[in-house]
């Protein structure tokens, strides 16, 4: 990262949330690529987590952990962000009971209201950029997003960007050519400029 700062100058603080000299969008992508190297197995279960920055064991995860971990690499803690926001603004969240810091940040239905407030929603016809976060619909007969991933910097056989994700049982974290067949319902990007408080 030192050479990047020397060549380009350090990015403004609002474009480098964690102060590591890497702009936010690239930092999210780097976090996602690290996950591909780690190859966490798809394991869906409820666990008691530390707080803040709690995580399941690195050897396992679900699709939402892709976003949690990639964003953490750029300085965002979705666990505390979503938990504290849901406590402050419960009407914005589809809570079934009191907010739960062990699981809420790992649920797409809880990510969506948080992302709408804190990240940039990208229009469907805008070009995909590496580091974009996508919420997808893998079950067309069941309304709503049920899968999540990060847009890669590599193209698949379709010519479209691959998606870093943890697909389902029997899979490990990796890049897949999902865009030709799995509808993207929502796309978000980490902010490159400061956003006003909601």
Protein language model features and the residues they cover:
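Low-complexity, Gly/Pro
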Residues: 1-4, 198
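...with weaker cross-activation on analogous glycine-rich loops/strands in unrelated enzymes
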Residues: 22, 87-169
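Low-complexity, Gly/Ser/Thr/Pro-rich intrinsically disordered linker/tail segments
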Residues: 158-198
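Short linear sequence elements within intrinsically disordered, low-complexity coil regions
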Residues: 51, 119-120, 193
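N-terminal capping segments
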Residues: 4-114
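A structural signal for short, hydrophobic beta-strand segments that form beta-sheets
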Residues: 78-79, 151, 182-184
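Residue-identity detector for threonine
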Residues: 1, 25, 64-66, 138, ...
């Amino acid at each position: 990262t030192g050479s990047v700062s020397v060549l380009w100058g350090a990015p403004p603080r609002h474009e480098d949330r964690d102060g590591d000299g890497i702009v936010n969008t690239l930092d999210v992508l780097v976090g996602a690529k690290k996950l591909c190297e780690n190859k966490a197995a798809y394991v869906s279960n409820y666990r008691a987590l530390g707080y803040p920055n709690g995580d399941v064991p690195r050897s396992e995860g679900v699709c939402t952990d892709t976003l949690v971990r990639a964003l953490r690499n750029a300085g965002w803690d979705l666990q505390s962000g979503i938990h504290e926001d849901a406590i402050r603004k419960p009407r914005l969240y589809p809570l079934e009971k009191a907010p739960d810091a062990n699981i809420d940040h790992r649920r797409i239905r809880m990510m969506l209201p948080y992302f709408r407030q804190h990240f940039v929603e990208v229009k469907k016809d805008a070009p995909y950029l590496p580091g974009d976060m996508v919420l997808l619909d893998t079950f067309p007969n069941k309304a709503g997003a049920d899968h999540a991933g990060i847009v890669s910097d590599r193209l698949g056989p379709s010519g479209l960007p691959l998606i870093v994700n943890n697909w389902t049982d029997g899979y490990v974290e990796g890049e897949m050519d999902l865009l030709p067949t799995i509808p993207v319902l929502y796309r978000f990007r980490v902010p490159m400029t400061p956003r006003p408080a909601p």
